[in-house]
Design a protein with these regions (language model features):
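Repeated scaffold domains used in trafficking and secretory/extracellular systems
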Residues: 215, 259-264
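Ligand-recognition surfaces built from glycine- and aromatic
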Residues: 426-444
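Secretory/extracellular carbohydrate-interaction modules
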Residues: 319-375
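Beta-rich carbohydrate-recognition and catalytic domains
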Residues: 1-153, 158-207, 219-257, 270, ...
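Short, solvent-exposed beta-strand-to-loop segments that form ligand-recognition rims
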Residues: 414-428
Length: 444
């Protein structure tokens, strides 16, 4: 399975009236349903990124591992799926989320295999013998739990000479948890005490969940930081949260926008620790009218803020997408808007009745998409981040990346807000912003 598809931007053509909503520089297949990113890993001169993918919008179809590679985390090439369900095998109904590691120079995947009718997804492993383009047969490496609300999404890493595996879990009695296993050889695994546990807490509109999906473990400034996706049987996906596992958990949101879930970590990269995430649709299912849904976020460098929350910034190579200054009276669907400093309001006028408003105060950023779309199925609402700016950081007050229906805003203090917007009016659009604002068109 080494045949490649065309590069992402060449696969994003549409003759429909919503062509301007299709992201061009974010990772996504030309059609079908995409969700969780999986197993980013540097191998040779490239980074490999896998992701949950279905070839159509049929959510009952078995999940495959889509595959993309990049030399710089910005210019991506899509390939054929690297992993597909094995008929009659331990993943016959879906290859669900996990991660990858290097095992004697080969890429080894750990993931959840789904079989219809079984209460849990089994933790499986499979090896690639062709540089990550495809994976061989899978087998189970840890037993299914006796009882749990949920058990899935392994994350494997090496630390202090040993291999460790975190698995998302939850129980009725003890709440959400990260199950933990140890191995000397990636083959034989022994269960140890959970890495973290937390009874479900709900306050101020935030919910830590009754179980945790997609656990990731980073080491930042000598501290072990878990990144989890909160989940509950009645509510489904919640928020992406982070916390120090060596003190009583105090989860904090990783992204303060409306559309970010199922983060996937790369512990070590040329830019330090990184996170990717799934940017789900911000519109009801009847609005998925162009044959695709779901996008992978931009890769994010991460560090710890003064309050121990996880902060984010775009990778430096994002600058290579800049194709020249954009006129504020003729903004395209792919652009970067930069406010170097100060307060004010950034308004992207899509049409007479459609606009996206971003307000900057001394300490907060607010994104209001209440009037961003006249489409009946598009979501609205406002999102806010406090403690948003750090003038001493050397970073702009805010960098706003627009890619069709995707908006990702990064502030100087490392706050990030991701959302989706669906203007019915195609570009060119008009930008109203403070006088010092810079704007670039972005092109692959």
């Amino acid at each position: 399975m080494t045949q490649t598809q065309p590069q992402i931007n060449s696969g994003h053509r549409s003759t429909g009236t919503v062509a301007h909503l299709r992201p061009a520089y974010h990772v996504r297949p030309p059609s079908g349903y995409l969700n969780d990113p999986n197993g980013p890993i540097e191998h040779g001169s490239d980074v490999h990124l896998y992701f949950q993918s279905r070839p159509t919008l049929d959510l009952q179809a078995p999940v495959e591992w889509g595959h993309a590679t990049s030399p710089d985390y910005v210019h991506w090439t899509l390939h054929r799926p690297a992993m597909a369900p094995q008929p009659g095998g331990p993943d016959t109904d879906g290859c669900w989320s996990g991660n990858t590691v290097l095992d004697d120079g080969r890429i080894r995947a750990f993931y959840s295999g789904r079989v219809e009718g079984r209460p849990y997804q089994s933790v499986l492993t499979a090896v690639s013998d062709d540089g990550g383009a495809s994976f061989g047969p899978a087998h189970q490496v840890v037993p299914d739990p006796d009882e749990a609300v949920m058990f899935r999404d392994p994350f494997v890493w090496k630390e202090n000479g040993a291999w460790w595996m975190a698995v998302g879990a939850g129980s009725v009695d003890r709440g959400a948890s990260i199950a933990l296993y140890r191995s000397a050889d990636l083959s034989q695994w022994t269960a140890v005490d959970p890495l973290a546990e937390l009874p479900r807490t709900r306050s101020d509109g935030e919910d830590t969940g009754s179980a945790w999906e997609c656990p990731q473990v980073l080491t930042i400034d000598g501290r072990r930081i878990a990144v989890i996706a909160s989940w509950s049987p009645e509510g489904g996906p919640g928020e992406v949260l982070s916390f120090d596992v060596d003190v009583p958990p105090a989860p904090q949101r990783v992204d303060l926008g409306t559309n970010f879930y199922a983060a996937s970590a790369l512990r070590e990269s040329r830019f330090g620790p990184l996170l990717f995430g799934w940017l789900p649709e911000g519109r009801d299912r009847p609005g998925w009218n162009d044959g695709w849904a779901g996008v992978i976020s931009l890769p994010r460098m991460v560090w710890l803020g003064p309050d121990s929350s996880l902060r984010s910034a775009p990778v430096p190579t994002m600058d290579t997408l800049r194709s020249g200054s954009a006129s504020p009276t003729a903004i395209g669907a792919q652009c970067e808007i930069v406010v170097p400093e100060g307060v004010g309001e950034v308004i992207l006028h899509f049409g007479d009745q459609e606009r996206l408003q971003i307000e900057l105060t001394d300490t907060t950023i607010t994104i209001d998409r209440s009037h961003a779309s006249l489409a009946p199925h598009a979501h609205g609402g406002r999102m806010i981040a406090t403690d948003a700016f750090d003038p001493s950081s050397g970073r702009p007050a805010v960098r706003i990346f627009l890619d069709g229906s995707v908006v990702e805003a990064f502030t100087s203090a490392g706050r990030v807000l991701s959302t989706r917007v669906y203007p019915t009016t195609p570009p060119p659009w008009r930008l109203e912003a403070p006088a010092n604002t810079q704007c670039w068109g972005l092109a692959r």
